[in-house]
Amino acid sequence: MTEQIYMKLNDKVKRPTLSKEKINRENKHFKRVVDQYERWCKDGGGYETRETYEDDIIKCLFESDHDGYQLAEFLKEEVYIEPDSELVDILDEVSTIMRSLTNEIVGQWVKENFLEIPSDVVGKKVNAKQGYRKYENHYITGIKPETYEVTVSDDINKKGGWVIRYEDITFLD
């Protein structure tokens, strides 16, 4: 199978991960949340530069829990603010920023490395892994070319399913 041979090259083309250095501060989701956070801080008497507010949100991106309340508590300890429900609502959007930034760098990686998922893989039987979860004897039900991912399901006729990185599947047929 040609796709199996191609996939053995995956150790040469590593999927990028988000790091503080790779954050696009011009990302629309990032800018929107920073704007809201800056407005919230300034309403409470804050007077820092925009870069300071951006750095606070970047710190939140790399916390293990993206729950707005937990991030508000983190910022309370980190930058000495007094959070309220409005801040919690603002910080609830951090997971959206994370997903947007990650999709942005992965999309760039896909373009730079000319990665394509063949359209004929839909319907093929695969085993897949995602973190500690394994999906055995599943079918590819869809393709997400912009992020080099596929959806897999145990039902071949299902639309959608679990989203798995293409390099983490093994063809069975």
Regions found by a protein language model. Give the residues of each.
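Short intrinsically disordered terminal tails
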Residues: 1-4, 117-121, 170-173
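N-terminal intrinsically disordered, low-complexity, charge/repeat-rich segments that act as generic
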Residues: 2-84
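Short interaction-hotspot residues at assembly and binding interfaces
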Residues: 78-93, 143-145
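Mixed-charge, Lys/Arg-rich low-complexity intrinsically disordered regions
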Residues: 85-122
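Intrinsically disordered, low-complexity, charged/polar segments
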Residues: 100-115, 155-173
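Basic/aromatic-rich interaction segments and small domains that mediate binding to polyanionic partners
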Residues: 129-166
